[in-house]
Amino acid sequence: MALLQISEPGLSAAPHQRRLAAGIDLGTTNSLVATVRSGQAETLADHEGRHLLPSVVHYQQQGHSVGYDARTNAALDTANTISSVKRLMGRSLADIQQRYPHLPYQFQASENGLPMIETAAGLLNPVRVSADILKALAARATEALAGELDGVVITVPAYFDDAQRQGTKDAARLAGLHVLRLLNEPTAAAIAYGLDSGQEGVIAVYDLGGGTFDISILRLSRGVFEVLATGGDSALGGDDFDHLLADYIREQAGIPDRSDNRVQRELLDAAIAAKIALSDADSVTVNVAGWQGEISREQFNELIAPLVKRTLLACRRALKDAGVEADEVLEVVMVGGSTRVPLVRERVGEFFGRPPLTSIDPDKVVAIGAAIQADILVGNKPDSEMLLLDVIPLSLGLETMGGLVEKVIPRNTTIPVARAQDFTTFKDGQTAMSIHVMQGERELVQDCRSLARFALRGIPALPAGGAHIRVTFQVDADGLLSVTAMEKSTGVEASIQVKPSYGLTDSEIASMIKDSMSYAEQDVKARMLAEQKVEAARVLESLHGALAADAALLSAAERQDIDDAAAHLSEVAQGDDVDAIEQAIKNVDKQTQDFAARRMDQSVRRALKGHSVDEV
């Protein structure tokens, strides 16, 4: 399937003119930029031949530095040296302070509760810091390619929510970049490996970077990359390995827990150096703050084993979501510098029953995949037959009568996607409808997550069920959700784009999925009860209107029978007996059959009054 290339006005390229595109891996610890030259994707190095750019920015009154220069200042000016800013993206200040209580920065809250970092250059938000990193990467690409970039593909963790994805887009725009697409990091890795090997089947992408962990189960078939399931933890990565080892070194060296920032940075640097060395050596000598000691790989493995186990539990959940067994996975792709840790490779190999793939540099594989995709999207490969299908992590739907959730787009549906369902009014003369957008796997509103609310007004005043409202859910390639409600006869509509100020955590996603399984039987019963109660309310509402209009058609005895049946239905509808409510509804229907027939006859007579048979 070829991707259709559509050029914007004024941007149409000559038949043989290549556009300049780049793939950017905006990482927590390090970032990279890559491009396709002479048909090969490659990462771009700086003047000293270094491909990685530390995701660190040092701010001063007169300017700022990014990367290695910034990192060298970290120990001397910790408060003005911002690192791992990706972890702060799209989060509220309260969330950040709860998750990361030991950050060496001073924060202030903006009016909407988002974080502002105090620096020598003034108050800066995470979007601005990310933009400065992107500018440095773009400058490297512009110099290497001898021209301005026509577009970029930027990778994000699969578990990034709407706010985090939107923040990444905002940072790119602030950096002056045209974003062709945001691409999930595991999907980018699949592109890098899938195109090279031409392999078909199920592949697991294990991505353990500096600050995030993602596991994706993908199916590769005839050039189609389909994500069957995703999982992970946006607050777990190699940085956590570093901090555990730094704390261990601090304890061994007898350094106070609340020492100054310079010593803390020195401890962290020593831990990082030791971690890297232990990937090749059985032990390493550490010198820090006047203390010298030996640390073995065995000690390091003992420290990080619980974190590695957490990643494997996420792998197990993702496999279950995908409906595949570990032995069905053909290959395991390792992504992220932290996958160089021997214990990680060993445990992942044991879990999947095969040695993981590491033939492409795990630091570079995501950027390479992004560059390949950017080259296609910018129009340099119009005959490409690659199609990307990402998925949404949790079902999306609407609240309906009775506090029920009607799922419109199920979990793990490939995106981009658009789905629509028709709804109707519940009461006579209803002229407005409240649209409550929900996220989650449970059957009741109280057990799902509220995403947004908006109202559709201007609905024609018709009998209950007379107006028809089409609600459309659209999730774009970046995972952003738009919901539109339109009344069919008038065309009146209202819409909303879901951009929460802060997002859903990975543990909450895992918990919601787990709860949906644990309470499945209970939820089905609760839904059946709620549906019967809604039907009872509808029947009573309709009957009340009919009696108010045409009670004269009934004898006293008939009216009493109907009133008794209605009273009984009203009573049992307050309880929890589904069968009793259903039987009471049937009884009301039975008692009102003759009444309904008389009302129909009366309506026909009124319609024919004054007309001859010939006219009919």
From Swiss-Prot:
Entry-linked SUPFAM superfamilies: Actin-like ATPase domain, Heat shock protein 70kD (HSP70), C-terminal subdomain, Heat shock protein 70kD (HSP70), peptide-binding domain
Tree of life domain: Bacteria
CDD domains: ASKHA_NBD_HSP70_HscA
Keyword entries, A-Z: ATP-binding, Chaperone, Nucleotide-binding
Alphabetized InterPro entries for the sequence: ATPase_NBD, Heat_shock_70_CS, HscA_NBD, HSP70_C_sf, HSP70_peptide-bd_sf, Hsp_70_fam, ISC_FeS_clus_asmbl_HscA
UniProt keyword Chaperone present: yes
Keyword Ligase: no
UniProt GO MF annotations: ATP binding; ATP hydrolysis activity; ATP-dependent protein folding chaperone; unfolded protein binding
GO BP term, example: iron-sulfur cluster assembly
Similarity comment: family membership: Belongs to the heat shock protein 70 family.
Purpose: Chaperone involved in the maturation of iron-sulfur cluster-containing proteins. Has a low intrinsic ATPase activity which is markedly stimulated by HscB. Involved in the maturation of IscU.
UniProt-recorded name of the protein: Chaperone protein HscA
